[in-house]
A protein has these predicted regions:
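N-terminal Rossmann NAD(P)H-binding glycine-rich loop of SDR-like oxidoreductase domains
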Residues: 1-19
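Glycine-rich Rossmann NAD(P)(H)-binding loop
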Residues: 2, 164, 188-195, 223-230, ...
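NAD(P)H-binding glycine-rich loop region in Rossmannoid oxidoreductase-like domains
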Residues: 5, 30-90, 96-99
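Conserved Rossmann-fold NAD(P)-dependent oxidoreductase catalytic core, especially the SDR/UDP-sugar
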Residues: 76-139, 147, 155
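Conserved beta-loop-beta element that borders a ligand/cofactor-binding pocket
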Residues: 141-166
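A conserved pocket-lining segment of Rossmann-fold NAD(P)-dependent short-chain dehydrogenase/reductase
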Residues: 178-200
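Mid/C-terminal beta-alpha module of Rossmann-like enzyme folds, strongest
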Residues: 208-270, 275, 308-324
Length: 324
């Protein structure tokens, strides 16, 4: 595995080890998650991956997995193993679809039909949120591995919005904090409240990766990974509340009635994925139910918040007062 000590990677390693696989993780050595205990660790800078190939290829390789192919590894990571490994697996994202460009507001439309399948139109614009810490757009990754498919058969897994323990983006932070603070209501911008996104609990996304690793039928195929149903943001917030045991209200309001920090200017575009291909071709099914996954995600998020200062709710209180 290239990478594997961040968010999704440790769960992939853990599940592969549980299957009895021999796992080598190449990473920068900044952290050694407990979940990866039992794997061989090789430390090095990704930009110098070629120098570490002898250490990584001491034993025969079946599959090489790049958890974060957006990071340059003397080029595209898995392609260094052409002629060495039998197959490759890369994790990209559903941001490759044109629908995401429409949602970002960099494509004037028209709104794209939902759900997207693996054959849906891809975006033509570069990602507007490509961070300075990334070298390749997900589209770059997919095109690069496709161009050399005769040398290495690579499975592409297009990941959803992922939630759960170890989430570096803290996607549940605002909601869980408000619930922990016993807020009577949580405000949502009306457009955000309607937005439907395909999500996936981290252990389930890891299981999708492991399913592809373990099944040769995945070679050269592209799969959407994620939950079979896509909740709106308002439905999602209520699901988080149910898992938390919060009895407050979800208050949906036009953005003109909201404080600036809660206004979310979004076009009328969802991003809902059809995940039937990986289910039908590889027999994928979730390991963890949504309520159970949310419970684990909430428990982890609460632990992160333990020593953090509380937010200022004054602008939200004023908005709630104005709505009554």
């Amino acid at each position: 595995m290239l990478g594997g000590t961040g968010f999704v990677g440790p769960f992939i390693v853990k599940q592969l080890l549980e299957l009895g696989c021999e796992v080598t993780v190449f990473h920068r050595g900044r952290r050694e998650p407990e979940l990866t205990a039992g794997a061989e660790h090789v430390h090095g800078e990704f930009a110098r991956l070629q120098e570490h190939l002898p250490a990584l290829t001491r034993r025969a390789l079946d599959v090489v997995v790049d958890v974060n192919p957006g990071l340059a590894k003397s080029g595209h990571g898995v392609l260094h193993f052409a002629g060495i490994a039998r197959r490759g697996v890369v994790l990209t994202s559903m941001d490759v679809y044109r629908a995401m460009s429409v949602l970002w507001g960099v494509d004037a439309g028209p709104p794209q039909q939902m759900p997207v399948t693996e054959e849906s139109e891809l975006r033509s614009q570069p990602s507007p949120d490509l961070g300075s810490n990334l070298d390749f757009d997900n589209l770059d990754v997919e095109r690069a591995v496709a161009a050399r498919s005769d040398e290495l058969a690579v499975t592409v897994l297009r990941c959803p919005v992922i939630y759960g323990p170890l989430d570096t983006q803290r996607r549940l932070q605002r909601y869980v904090r408000a619930m922990a603070d016993a807020r009577p209501a949580i405000l949502l911008d009306s457009r955000l409240a309607r937005l439907r996104l395909t999500r996936g609990y981290v252990e389930n996304v890891a299981h999708a990766v492991v399913t592809a690793v373990a099944d040769d039928r995945s070679a050269g195929r592209t799969y959407n990974a994620g939950e079979h149903d896509a909740l709106s943001e308002a439905e999602w917030l209520r699901a988080v509340g149910a898992a938390f045991g919060w009895n407050g209200d979800v208050v949906v309001a036009d953005q003109t009635a909201l404080p600036a920090k809660l206004r979310v200017p979004l076009p009328d575009q969802d991003l809902v994925a059809d995940t039937s291909r990986i289910r039908h071709e590889l027999g994928y099914a979730e390991l963890v139910s949504r309520p159970e996954g949310l419970g684990r995600a909430i428990e982890w998020e609460l632990a992160q918040q333990r020593d953090e200062p509380g937010p200022d709710y004054s602008s939200e209180d004023a908005a709630l007062l104005g709505l009554h």
